[in-house]
């Protein structure tokens, strides 16, 4: 039986095959020809000027009203929530809690348990969420910056209203008819112990307060630039998601790349170190043009690792590689605007004109 080649061996093989020297990305290099490869996805081309119209995102503290419900007057307070938040309360009950708005009795019973439960950690979680999100000045500023930059690119898109809520570990972000929501109890830190009961370890990386703005913007982009069901090949999915990541990075100019994609710094460094090997493995297996759902899910969906590449890799490597290709495409075609990029649906053309050769 032919031994399974490790990613590291594949990496070395691909470099040897191309007659080049293997160099780790975190080494200091003096070879000018490699500079373009080493600068990563931080495309510094100025697509959005500094002097743009500022927009103010309205943040509604529904979470505070939720947690002000009193155990001895739950029904009365729930009725008041419907009156005070008639726009959002039905969305919250049906979309987040998956209950009928007409079933007030069950909602009150569930809410009583939600306020006092200590087994699942709801009471402790609610208290911590209130404390961590007591001051949202930084969140407000970051949202204003992100949506101001997006408004410059797409002024026809309506700025959403953002509600903060506690979800009972049901939802991180949501979007419905230009109303967005953030489940603040899902952003209490990747080391928050009660998350061990509700999510896998690999999912906890983005359950941090710093990820709220990126998650909101990412969902907003996905809603306004919907996925085309005709994208049935891996290449098309990679380029589509890569374009979304490129746009998201322009809205978060002060965020490092690993935060934009939701990796740890160590995961990002691993990808950069083995980028050539990753690409060689994809090409060697001819995965770019595969349509099998197992292959697509392995590359594009979140998971502990990308099974098609290596158990040492982070998940969603297809997204990461797609972003690298799109970034290379924009670097090598500086006259292309972001609008033109987002309206270019020929994934093969983007790949060819990216000159992506890690």
Across the structure, where does each feature detected by a protein language model lie?
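Acidic/His-rich structured neighborhood in mature extracellular/periplasmic domains
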Residues: 109-268
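Bacterial N-terminal signal peptides that target proteins for export
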Residues: 5, 15-29
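C-terminal soluble interaction/assembly domains
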Residues: 290-358
């Amino acid at each position: 039986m032919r031994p399974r080649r490790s990613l590291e061996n594949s990496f070395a093989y691909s470099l040897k095959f191309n007659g080049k020297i293997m160099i780790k990305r975190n080494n200091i290099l003096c070879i000018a020809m490699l500079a373009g490869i080493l600068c990563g996805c931080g495309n510094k081309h100025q697509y959005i000027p500094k002097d743009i119209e500022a927009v103010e995102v309205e943040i509604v503290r529904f979470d505070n009203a939720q947690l002000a419900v009193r155990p001895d007057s739950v029904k009365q307070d729930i009725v008041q929530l419907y009156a005070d938040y008639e726009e959002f309360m039905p969305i919250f009950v049906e979309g987040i809690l998956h209950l009928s708005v007409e079933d007030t009795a069950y909602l009150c019973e569930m809410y009583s348990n939600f306020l006092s439960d200590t087994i699942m950690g709801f009471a402790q979680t609610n208290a911590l969420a209130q404390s961590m999100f007591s001051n949202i000045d930084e969140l407000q500023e970051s949202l204003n910056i992100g949506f101001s930059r997006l408004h410059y690119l797409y002024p026809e898109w309506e700025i959403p209203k953002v509600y903060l809520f506690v979800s009972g570990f049901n939802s991180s972000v949501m979007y419905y008819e230009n109303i967005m929501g953030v489940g603040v109890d899902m952003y209490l830190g990747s080391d928050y112990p009660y998350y061990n009961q509700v999510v896998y370890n690999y999912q906890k990386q983005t359950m941090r307060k710093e990820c709220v703005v990126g998650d909101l913007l990412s969902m907003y982009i996905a809603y306004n630039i919907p996925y085309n069901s005709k994208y049935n090949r891996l290449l098309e999915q990679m380029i589509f998601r890569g374009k979304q990541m490129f746009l998201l990075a322009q809205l978060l100019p002060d965020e490092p790349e690993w935060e934009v994609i939701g990796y740890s710094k160590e995961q990002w460094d691993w990808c950069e170190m083995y980028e050539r090997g990753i690409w060689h493995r994809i090409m060697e297996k001819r995965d770019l043009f595969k349509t099998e759902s197992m292959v697509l899910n392995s590359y594009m969906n979140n998971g502990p690792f990308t099974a098609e590449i290596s158990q040492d890799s982070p998940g969603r490597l297809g997204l990461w590689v797609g972003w690298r290709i799109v970034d290379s495409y924009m670097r090598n075609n500086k006259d292309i605007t972001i609008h033109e990029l987002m309206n270019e649906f020929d994934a093969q053309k983007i790949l060819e004109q990216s000159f992506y050769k890690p």
